[in-house]
A protein has these predicted regions:
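Conserved functional hotspot residues or short segments at active or partner-binding sites
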Residues: 314, 319-417
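Glycine-rich, aromatic-lined ligand/substrate-binding cores of catalytic
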Residues: 267-346
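Bacterial Sec-dependent N-terminal signal peptides
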Residues: 1-61
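Short internal beta-strands
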Residues: 114-123, 204
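Glycine/threonine-rich flexible loop motifs
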Residues: 175-187
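Glycine-rich, charge-decorated loop segments at or immediately adjacent to ligand/cofactor-binding or catalytic sites
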Residues: 126-132, 202-224
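Glycine-rich oxoanion-binding loops at beta->alpha junctions
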Residues: 136-166, 178
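Conserved anion/nucleotide-ligand pocket segment
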Residues: 223-295
């Protein structure tokens, strides 16, 4: 209406200079006004275009990332869901985000998320406790949050009191893909506790560095322990979230309860993807090679031999003082705080094999764990009656492997005995895969 009013009076004939000036003045204003009407939509479109680029900031940031992106690192996918909830976090030193390796806890606190409690697994929340050491409850110095140990004094499962006031639990821990790595058991107990207390569990999934193959004897549940709770092989070939789905799907939680899961998948990942862990998953797994050899070498924890604990190269050397004269390679385990205070064969020179130069491509080409070292060193050991200890059966998941080695069975014969249980597991596994 204003535009019409101006136009109506601006075009009136003018007989005086005053009216001419007024007319010119009005005409100039009309031209400016018309130009603004034409240009304004264009300006708006530019502004809107800029907003469309920068408004979804977090999505744009994610798209710039290349390669494998962990669930935790995709904050834009779950941050809104966390707002307004009281959060508990099952985390440790591996729970990091981005190239800066910021702890996911610290990142979420900075984003204004309400974290109420931290739950720490084996090796503790900061990952500085030795293998098997009891870890006590504490207060995190940086955040001031209570840290509840779920690996200490047989306290593996969060109690209703531990979970009081928690609306949502987050599980964000790096696994290495071996049945006897205890974070799997921690996950199971956390899922049971959440299911029993009607708490949803969000899993920020991470790659499995040994996820490219499945191998080993399937656990006989008669040998159920914290280093093996269910009928899966030593190398299970699952990520944490995939295993969580299996726990639900196979009814393996106590009383067959079902845990409500909310999974944030790993982006750009397949089971054949090579993955270097940004942080050591535990004090004695401090190299890519040790992580790849861990499923094979950890069986020596069930023997009298040293596998390098008490050195800076654990899981990369195996030996014993009694093997002097049969092997020239030697090493000496000592007490190392935060890694192994009381390692097997402490302060003794051990003779055996050096795996430092072992080509791990042998694993990816064969898709098999190595039994040859176990058979070789058993045969070389002079006191065979004391080679194995009771822990070996828990690690192997079966009484048969020890009997087979003692009976002189070949690796081929031993592997044949793992069927059909191993094939049945592989078929079952397919149902729970989230990645190709």
């Amino acid at each position: 209406m204003y535009f019409l009013y101006l136009r109506k009076y601006a075009v009136l004939p003018c007989k005086t200079d005053t009216f001419k000036l007024l007319r010119q003045h009005f005409m100039i204003r009309i031209k400016v006004f018309i130009q603004l009407l034409i240009i304004a939509p264009l300006l708006c479109s530019v502004v809107m275009a800029q907003k469309s680029i920068y408004k979804p900031y977090k999505i744009a940031a994610t798209e710039k990332k290349e390669g494998i992106i962990t669930g935790a690192d995709q904050t834009e996918l779950y941050i809104d869901y966390l707002k307004g909830k009281n959060i508990g976090m099952v985390i440790n030193q591996t729970s990091v985000i981005g190239k800066s390796l910021t702890l996911s806890l610290d990142s979420l606190l900075k984003l204004g998320i309400t974290i109420k409690k931290i739950y720490g697994p084996e090796h503790g929340f900061r990952g500085d406790a030795s293998n098997g050491a009891d870890v006590s409850n504490s207060i995190d110095a940086k955040s001031g949050l209570p840290v509840i140990s779920i690996y200490g004094n047989k306290h593996y499962k969060p109690t209703p009191g531990d979970l009081k006031g928690i609306d949502l639990m987050i599980y964000d821990i790096q696994d290495v893909g071996a049945r006897f790595y205890t974070y799997l058991s921690t996950l199971q107990y956390v899922m049971e506790a959440c299911a029993e207390n009607n708490i949803e569990l969000m899993i920020l999934d991470r790659p499995n560095p040994n996820g490219f193959y499945v191998d080993g004897p399937v656990l006989d549940t008669i040998n159920h322990s914290f280093v093996g709770m269910n009928a899966i092989p030593i190398i299970h070939g699952l990520t944490t979230a995939e295993y969580a789905q299996m726990l639900n799907g196979e009814g393996w939680l106590k009383n067959h309860v079902q845990c409500k899961l909310n999974i944030v998948k790993v982006a750009n990942y397949s089971h054949s993807s090579a993955y270097t862990l940004p942080v050591n998953p535990s004090p004695n797994l401090n190299t890519d090679k040790s992580i790849l050899l861990y499923p094979s070498v950890c069986l020596f924890e069930g023997t009298t031999l040293s596998l390098g604990r008490g050195t800076m190269r654990p899981f990369l050397q195996i030996g014993h003082p009694a093997l002097q004269g049969k092997y020239t390679y030697s090493f000496k385990p000592v007490s190392i705080k935060g890694m192994s205070e009381a390692p097997p064969q402490k302060d003794k020179v051990c003779y055996g094999i050096n795996l430092e130069n072992y080509n791990t491509n042998n694993i990816s080409s064969s898709n098999q764990l190595n039994l040859a070292w176990l058979i070789e060193l058993y045969n070389a050991f002079p006191d065979k009656e004391h080679f194995f200890n009771a822990y070996f059966t828990k690690l192997a998941g079966t009484t048969e492997l020890r009997k087979q080695i003692e009976a002189g069975k070949s690796e081929e014969e031993i592997r044949a005995s793992w069927e059909p249980a191993l094939s049945n597991y592989k078929n079952m596994r397919v149902k729970y895969l989230l990645y190709p």
